[in-house]
Amino acid sequence: MSNKIFTHSLPMRYADFPTLVDALDYAALGSAGMSFYDRRCQLEEELEYQTLKARAEAGAKRLLSLNLKKGDRVALIAETSSGFVEAFFACQYAGLVAVPLAIPMGVGQRDSWSAKLQGLLASCQPAAIITGDEWLPLVNAATHNNPELHVLSHAWFKALPEADVALQRPVPNDIAYLQYTSGSTRFPRGVIITHREVMANLRAISHDGIKLRPGDRCVSWLPFYHDMGLVGFLLTPVATQLSVDYLRTQDFAMRPLQWLKLISKNRGTVSVAPPFGYELCQRRVNEKDLAELDLSCWRVAGIGAEPISAEQLHQFAECFRQVNFDDKTFMPCYGLAENALAVSFSDEASGVVVNEVDRDILEYQGKAVAPDAETRAVSTFVNCGKALPEHGIEIRNEAGIPVAERVVGHICISGPSLMSGYFGDQISQDEIAATGWLDTGDLGYLLDGYLYVTGRIKDLIIIRGRNIWPQDIEYIAEQEPEIHSGDAIAFVTAQEKIILQIQCRISDEERRGQLIHALAARIQSEFGVTAAIDLLPPHSIPRTSSGKPARAEAKKRYQKAYAASLHVQESLA
């Protein structure tokens, strides 16, 4: 199949529309669209925005033929396909609430996914669920006790009759979709996002954050069930009339270099990934791959979704400098589903800007003080930019009082993109309506108005009044040549015992013992604390739907195993 390489053919508008429906209506007047690629980087399907609009309007009438009413939820298994996109926009035209849900993304996850899906469906109470054929058996198994739920494959959905009704356009305060959080610290919650809220974020992203241009072309492997994939690379291109190229997330995981090859092949200019995406490419690349790449076209290389390692990005930049990658294109950012997506972006063409602070002062006093001659060790944090226009960032203490710059505290946000609350949680909805602010659950500090994120509140390791960041301990493990980035996870137990779990591929017992002793010694030397090193088989570390390490789940599993071992010991006593 040949690629028409859709071009921008309309006067560019930066998401200045009242609803997602209005955004697609305008994009459909031009010739831009979406292209879907397989794992070999071969074009599978093209979907022009004018075609998407026609299919979405027809799909809306099909959904209404099921006697669904305005505000009903429609769960969508969010695979990277035109079927998902068409169903999502069909919900918008029908006045229904789309609920993108994750697909299984790893070895042996299908059984646990079915149980998780049951929980998500119980949470959002959808009237219908639409899925690709691959996931239909799992969906049927998860929904067999709910005979009133309409379970549809994409083919069955397209075969429904169209209701003979006039579509009622949504208004800005209508709910557009529920975005389930990744669940890094608790069971995922459904974030309520209205058309007004998402359009405010899309405008801020496109006009003030990334600063999109008419000639830009987006490339993404990010999943549509994650806010970076859904808002950043499905809704943003539509709202700015830009074309976008997609790889399936699972294909990227198997062949990460296909991401860079697609950027090079189609002269992509804007692409964003979590840090592990860059690390995977740098680890897997070889000389043959490099010979196929020219990354001079890449204008914005965004980074977000997890703590950002400057060293990791430096290694990527050094590796791909020979194929014209410019490290100034790096654009660290901060965001979360509760703000639709983005809160802040670093300055354009500034690259990765870091702030080094005295680690001891940080851990004992909670202040990000510049190192001096007396400094024993430093911690490094990445500049994630200033708040987007009309949005606010405050750092507050435990009492909710704003603190001075360089003081670490709770990152709190406000602005027109802030969610209406969590679905089914009236208290959260009332609190946001009353205050207009949200405590994100993240910790960080401001310096000259720029945000530096230090970690999650619930992940913080507190030992004898000292605050230790788990990523600092994990970083020590990841410096070992046999341990990859993301293969280590650190947490503290209820007994105040620090645990460092490592996915280890080393089979030699002597080498495993050496690794344990070396890491324990380094952690003792660096932090003055004792850590228990636990070597695990590959694929053992739990992750959220967005690929982040789920420290709370790892801790839960460890405590469960610990309790079981105590029970056995007591039984044998």
Predicted regions and their residues:
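N-lobe entry segment of adenylate-forming
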Residues: 1-47, 51-66, 70, 94, ...
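Conserved ATP-binding/catalytic segment of the ANL
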Residues: 20, 380-394, 398-406, 410-470
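Conserved pre-ATP/AMP-binding loop-to-beta segment of ANL
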Residues: 32, 161-180, 186-187, 197, ...
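Conserved AMP-binding/adenylate-forming core of the ANL superfamily
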Residues: 35-86, 106-115, 167-169, 190-199
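Conserved AMP-binding/adenylation subdomain of ANL enzymes
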Residues: 199-217, 227-269, 284-289
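AMP-binding/adenylate-forming catalytic core of the ANL superfamily
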Residues: 264, 271, 415, 420-421, ...
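Gly/Ser/Thr-rich phosphate-binding loop
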Residues: 268-272, 284-377, 392, 399-401
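Conserved C-terminal "lid"/linker of ANL adenylate-forming enzymes
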Residues: 487-491, 500, 520-573
